[in-house]
């Protein structure tokens, strides 16, 4: 029954994702000359199309390699191919759910189904998620400290959203650190907040909320133990995460070169793409659709001048997000098809 409820939940979120996607496509392509758009896309050099595809696959697969690396660190032997599959599944469910909230639970579901113990799987996924948020927060802070003028010049009115996105990421990292290092304090504060809310007339089931919080804190307690016992592995994880994130920032520069453009330094394009990621990462919109395209159009207008802006956006988002989403969906369908097939085979055998 719980599984059916989860399927319905993800089904609704998928249809919401499709609705936002169609709206985004409509806004981006409105008023475009499609024959000119097609001819511009065709002119992109094949070697850079291939490089962009490689980077996009690398971005998702790198997370799978990190999961595999950490699982093996705790003595769980798992194939890299399986972990890359978990990563693509996570990418798909993160892409279709608000604030990317659906990815990690589904990754944990598939890992548990494959026989990976829940405590170890939870600790590994939380370590990967924490490293990701930490790296993004550090990158965002560095950009703000050293390239604020460039940011304000290119982001314009979207600079506000950059500050919001960066602030949310930094606050989340601080919260995660408190959760890992001071869980008793977090529980005490949460209990006080619930009591205050109840006094204000809000009907909050205190015991139920605290039970959920305890489960959340227990998960991070395992992550703390993992951090303490594998300090050198965590340093490697942070370096791997930085390389992974940088590959996503580099994608736009490859598209820039693919159209034969020049005049803008590589570091500027990387910084601007990183700024977009920081701004939209925490927004409660599936796949950060709409706001990502809007920011891309504003930020990269001086870079992809004239007829190249929309084609560049189509390639960057198409290859870096939508194509990877399709691959993730195919992996999920394959796994579920195998499960149904094995279930029928087992039923026939029992009969």
Give the positions of each predicted feature.
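Membrane-embedded helical hairpins/re-entrant loop segments and their flanking transmembrane helices
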Residues: 64-88, 255-272
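Hydrophobic residues within alpha-helical transmembrane segments
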Residues: 54, 58, 89, 127-134, ...
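Membrane-interface helix starts
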Residues: 11-15, 43-52, 225-239
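Membrane-interface interhelical connector segments
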Residues: 188-228
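Alpha-helical transmembrane segments of multi-pass membrane proteins
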Residues: 81-90, 267-278, 307-318
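Transmembrane helix-loop-helix hairpins in multi-pass inner-membrane proteins
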Residues: 1-35, 39, 93-205, 285, ...
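Alpha-helical transmembrane segments and their immediate interhelical loop/hinge regions
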Residues: 211-260
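A short amphipathic helical element positioned immediately N-terminal to and/or at the very start
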Residues: 35-43, 111, 216-228
């Amino acid at each position: 029954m719980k599984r059916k409820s989860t399927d319905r939940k993800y089904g609704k979120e998928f249809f919401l994702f499709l609705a936002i996607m169609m709206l985004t496509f409509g806004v981006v392509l409105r008023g475009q000359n499609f024959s000119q758009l097609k001819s511009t896309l065709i002119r992109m050099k094949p070697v850079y199309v291939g490089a962009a595809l490689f980077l996009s696959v690398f971005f998702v697969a790198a997370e799978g390699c990190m999961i595999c690396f950490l699982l093996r660190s705790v003595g769980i032997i798992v194939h890299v191919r399986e972990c890359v599959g978990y990563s693509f599944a996570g990418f798909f469910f993160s892409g279709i759910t608000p604030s990317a909230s659906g990815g990690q639970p589904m990754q944990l579901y598939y890992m548990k189904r494959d026989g990976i113990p829940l405590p170890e799987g939870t600790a590994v996924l939380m370590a990967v998620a924490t490293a990701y948020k930490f790296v993004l927060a550090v990158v965002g802070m560095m950009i703000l400290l050293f390239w604020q003028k460039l940011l304000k010049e290119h982001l314009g009115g979207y600079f506000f959203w950059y500050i919001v996105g960066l602030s949310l990421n930094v606050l989340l990292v601080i919260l995660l650190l408190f959760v890992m290092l001071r869980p008793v304090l977090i529980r005490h504060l949460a209990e006080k907040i619930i009591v205050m809310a109840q006094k204000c007339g809000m009907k909050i089931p205190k015991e139920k909320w605290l039970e959920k919080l305890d489960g959340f804190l227990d998960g991070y307690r395992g992550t703390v133990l993992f951090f303490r016992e594998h300090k050198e592995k965590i340093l490697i994880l942070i370096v791997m995460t930085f390389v992974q994130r940088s590959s996503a920032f580099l994608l736009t520069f490859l598209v820039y070169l693919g159209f034969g453009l020049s005049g803008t330094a590589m570091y500027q394009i990387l910084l601007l793409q990183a700024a977009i990621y920081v701004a939209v990462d925490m927004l409660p919109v599936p796949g950060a659709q709409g706001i990502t395209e809007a920011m891309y159009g504003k930020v990269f207008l001086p870079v992809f001048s004239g007829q190249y802006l929309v084609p560049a956006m189509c390639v960057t988002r198409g290859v870096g997000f939508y194509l990877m989403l399709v691959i993730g969906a195919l992996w999920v369908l394959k796994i579920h098809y195998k499960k149904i097939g094995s279930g029928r085979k087992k039923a026939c055998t029992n009969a």
